[in-house]
Amino acid sequence: MKIHEYQAKELFANYGVPVPKGKPVFSVDEAVEAAKELGDFPVVVKAQIHAGGRGKGGGVKLAQNIDEVKTIAGEILGMQLVTHQTGPEGQKVQKLLVEQGLDIAKELYFSIIVDRATAKIVIMCSEAGGMDIEEVAASTPEKIIKVPVDPLLGVQGYHCRQAAYRLNLPPAAIKPFIKMVQGLYKMFMDTDCSLLEINPLVLTGDDGIIALDAKINFDDSALYRHKDIQEYRDLDEEEPLEVEASKFNLNYIKMDGNVGNMVNGAGLAMATMDIIKQAGAEPANFLDVGGGANAEQVENGFRIILSDKNVKGILINIFGGILRCDVLASGVVEAAKKVGLNVPVVVRMEGTNVEEGRRILAESGLNLTGAEDLKDAAAKVAQIVQ
C-alpha cells in the first residue's frame, strides 16, 4: 500500500525524523491560509499523488508571495499530472502540500529496502540526490552506497556511521544523521514497510538534516496489524478495478494490453502473460484467482476482466488442483450470463474434473474456444485480438 508524502512525513515526525513545516490542503483558499500560517516565504506548493517525478511534471513549484501561492495552487489542483510513473493518462491532483522553503546546501538520496537475495534490510544512499535514482544506478553505480543490516541484529551505530562517512557529511551533521537513520529503521520495522525513500534528503546551510520528500510503501499482507496505517489508504489514487478486486480477495493488477487473462497461481499467471507477449499480443491484466477459489470468486474475477473496456479477448488458463475445472467452468458460465459476454474467450484447462469442466463450457452456448496447450491458447487469443 502506498501513502501520500504528507502522510509519510507525519509518520517520520512521530519517529523523530526532521521534516519541513507544512500542511495538506484541498482547495486554493486552504493553500493561501496554510502559506499565511507558515509566515515566511518562499513556500513550496506540492501536488500529492502516488507517483514520483512530480517536479518534472509541473507538480512542484516555488511561491514567493501569497499571490503566487493562489495562482500556483489553482494551476495544480485539478490538473492531470503526467509523470514517468503515472503513464500517459496521468493522475488527477486532488490535494496539495504547502510547506516552508529551506536553505539547501546539498541534496542526498536515502532509502531503506528489503533485499530478498541476501535476506537483509539494506540502507541505500547516494550523494546524487534529487535525481532519478534508477538513472544514477544504471549510469554511475559507484555513486550508490549500500549498507546491509541483519534484521536479527538491527541497525547499529557503525551502520549509520558507515553511511554518513561515505556520504561525506560534515562533522556537525553526522550525529543528527545517525539519529535520523535509527528512527527511520525503527519505523520501517514497526510498521512493516516494504520501501522507505527520501529523495532528496537535504543538508541545510547550518548542517541540519531534513527529509524534504517522503515515500513509503507498506506490505499489504501485514496491514491487518496496523489499523492506523490502513486509515491512510486513498482509494482515489488506486485503479478502480484493483480496488474492486481486493474486495473479493483477488490478486488483480490492471495493465495496458487487450488480452484479459484469468489464471490460478501467481507463477502460472506470470508465465501466461509472458507467452501472450511471445504470441504477439499484450496482456490487459494480471489475475490470480488462487488455488482455493470458489465459483463466486471466479465469477467476480471474470466480471472485473470484462469491465476493462480495452479487453478484446480473454485467455483462461487453469490447472485444476484445489480449484477444480468444473468449479471454474461454472463460475465462468454464470459470470458470462450475468455480465454479458461480448468478447471471445479461449480456455485451456487441465487437471481435476477437466472433462466435466469442458462439458459445462461446451453446453453453455457461449463464444468459447478450446485449446490443447498453453502455446496453442496464446496463439489463438493473439489471432483473435489482432
UniProtKB/Swiss-Prot annotation:
The keyword Metal-binding applies. Keywords: ATP-binding, Ligase, Magnesium, Metal-binding, Nucleotide-binding, Tricarboxylic acid cycle. Pathway: Carbohydrate metabolism; tricarboxylic acid cycle; succinate from succinyl-CoA (ligase route): step 1/1. Pfam families: ATP-grasp_2, Ligase_CoA. Its EC number is 6.2.1.5. Succinyl-CoA synthetase functions in the citric acid cycle (TCA), coupling the hydrolysis of succinyl-CoA to the synthesis of either ATP or GTP and thus represents the only step of substrate-level phosphorylation in the TCA. The beta subunit provides nucleotide specificity of the enzyme and binds the substrate succinate, while the binding sites for coenzyme A and phosphate are found in the alpha subunit. This is Succinate--CoA ligase [ADP-forming] subunit beta. It comes from Desulfatibacillum aliphaticivorans. The lineage of its organism: Bacteria, Pseudomonadati, Thermodesulfobacteriota, Desulfobacteria, Desulfobacterales. The gene is sucC.
